[in-house]
Amino acid sequence: MSVRLVLAKGREKSLLRRHPWVFSGAVARMEGKANLGETIDIVDHQGKWLARGAYSPASQIRARVWTFDPSESIDIAFFTRRLQQAQKWRDWLAQKDGLDSYRLIAGESDGLPGITIDRFGNFLVLQLLSAGAEYQRAALISALQTLYPECAIYDRSDVAVRKKEGMELTQGPITGELPPALLPIEEHGMKLLVDIQHGHKTGYYLDQRDSRLATRRYVENKRVLNCFSYTGGFAVSALMGGCSQVVSVDTSHEALDIARQNVELNKLDLSKAEFVRDDVFKLLRTYRDRGEKFDVIVMDPPKFVENKSQLMGACRGYKDINMLAIQLLNEGGILLTFSCSGLMTSDLFQKIIADAAIDAGRDVQFIEQFRQAADHPVIATYPEGLYLKGFACRVM
């Protein structure tokens, strides 16, 4: 008999709506003993079967649902089916947009909670972010090897969130050759170098692909400031869009060096690209105080908020940095501003920008809205999957 997690009375509603998480407060008791990440059955207070998921005793998310089908076992065949389902959509996208790199698995939204897989050419970069994902590592890798024999698999599960579920951080090759120091990929006509082994996340922010392309419509003959530039994806896109100058700012010397290489790789005019290693908050104030002006500013900061207790502080940070950006824009200038914090709703982010405009003493029009690229889908029953939001704002 399988181990069962019994829900408290009245706490089954979210599962009946097919939300994939069970929080610790919804649990009445465990029937049997389960190891970290082990598959369990989830039942209501009367014993009615609801779902099958992975158990995580140390996490606030006590179980993550693998399946709502009682006949479905969690094995190699299960992961093979999920991967094949996900690949169908990515095949269509890759053909339509000419992609050689994309997010293959977007966690819960692809029916594989706690699992992220990005494909860069013939490298699959894997992040196992939950106890259940780690427990099923061998089955998942077996399915990947069968479906993608041409691909090497590299582990980038060096993510702090694993510690919350009692797991060590892991990184390194799983199968196949080691990724090169910098792997070239293609995106909307750009060639870009990706550092799989040491770069942020899995090496590159694939979720901003469509936003980088959209930038081009705003930048012709414009002076652009690219904040938190990382390896220069927005900068390269701005140069391809015909900007007169782009200034890329980041604290990482390594990232800025790759950004410079990306400009050269695309045979763009390096004299139009400036690379500044500095703290963005500090530099924006310096620019303001000396009267610098820009026509377009890209504001793509890292995540400011990891949990609800940090949300108010994050709101202040987003407001401050957008206020400074608005102050630096010429009349009619465009602010392309983003938040990748899942706890920051689109409505709240829009309000923060509006408040920032008031503090900056400028009027702002919202003219376009952005979200993560289509290879990062959001399943309807899991709205938390929509983590990236952005706006194009015209400053008056």
UniProtKB/Swiss-Prot annotation:
SMART domains: PUA. PROSITE patterns: PUA. One of its GO terms (cellular component) is cytoplasm. Keywords: Cytoplasm, Methyltransferase, RNA-binding, rRNA processing, S-adenosyl-L-methionine, Transferase. Transmembrane segments: none annotated. It catalyses: cytidine(1962) in 23S rRNA + S-adenosyl-L-methionine = 5-methylcytidine(1962) in 23S rRNA + S-adenosyl-L-homocysteine + H(+). Pfam families: Methyltrans_SAM, PUA_3. Residues 2-81 form the PUA domain. Its EC number is 2.1.1.191. One of its GO terms (molecular function) is rRNA (cytosine) methyltransferase activity. It is found in: Cytoplasm. HAMAP family: 23SrRNA_methyltr_I. Belongs to the methyltransferase superfamily. RlmI family. Specifically methylates the cytosine at position 1962 (m5C1962) of 23S rRNA. This is Ribosomal RNA large subunit methyltransferase I. It comes from Escherichia coli (strain UTI89 / UPEC). The gene is rlmI.
